[in-house]
């Protein structure tokens, strides 16, 4: 099987090109220069004033991060300067990038906050050399995952079919049967893992030709240089004397102010530290690690049932990164004994996996349910899929920062379409759209300004979305037609676009008299 994995990996690498990496996604900045901060009387300044001074003195921190396409071009130029020729394929740069990182003994990364579900999630952006290394490590993980249909990040069709296939197999094998399921979600996924776990997995399955590359790449992962936002710097400077009971925060603040420990420079936004893995960076590799645990526990459960109870159960597992599920069908009607044994089997994996750094979140897991399983935020009750539309509806009234009203309407309509796709009825979508309209007009000040009545009159005469009028769908097709159809209806049935309509209705005559023709054509 190792020869087959090696052939598949080489084939995938051969089809890789610079276009797959040279995207418009962000790349990390260089971490060569420390942050310039003059002595400030922070007690006399607000946090925002401190922030403005830092941004003024450090222009590079304010600039947008370079795009991957620009970073790839710069890296190719460096390769050409050092090697004396241009790379013919992206894989030629892989050993060169890995050697540079191994000599540096770390890699650079930027960290920033991304709003998500009412809070912030940390997002990490790797430097371009590490991005190339990471891509090929993940590529090998994808090659292996394709041979395990239970892994859903590389086999997305499994998410929709695994419940149906399980019940189909159970019906064909048994006249009557009972099905017990487990929906498990792991907690602290990136904090609990270390790349040594993944290295041990690769040592068992990777071809000998790829082991040096994979092990050296994963050995780099614990050693990082992180650049965090300057907003955190201004917050620390403003609250240097604030009393805090957290020893971790106090240690971080002390090392920040003295330039010791993880900080190489005083009052800097660059730290060097050791940790396991980053959120989302080794996504497929961690999913493969979880697949190893799930598939082994499936074999173990089947063997226990077969040897101890003389039963051949139908067992199905499914997992994708930190999310997992398991279904066991045994012959006969449900009894207390069969339920107790099945739940013990389902709980077994959660107890064993703690020794492999996969910790089950009790709050987000349901173990031992009968004919009911949740996976990827979708509930399956036998052949029926139950989708929680609340997760989309709750996002419908989130307002994004836009420069034009029409952009806001497109975002609103896009989220509304997701509600419809997630299982909401057109009536629900119509009510959500009315709430979006109310929120939009409230943000314009219609509930507080004296000029609201006059604006109502103007909008009734000229419902122009570019001026703030909120277009709505027909109730029967809410979330279906889109903004373009809304604009078409406004153009056709209202005064909106009357000037454009008049211009389009003006036709040029095709008939000319002799007087209209020039002398040369008479």
Where are these regions (language model features)?
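Viral RNA-dependent RNA polymerase
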Residues: 1-522
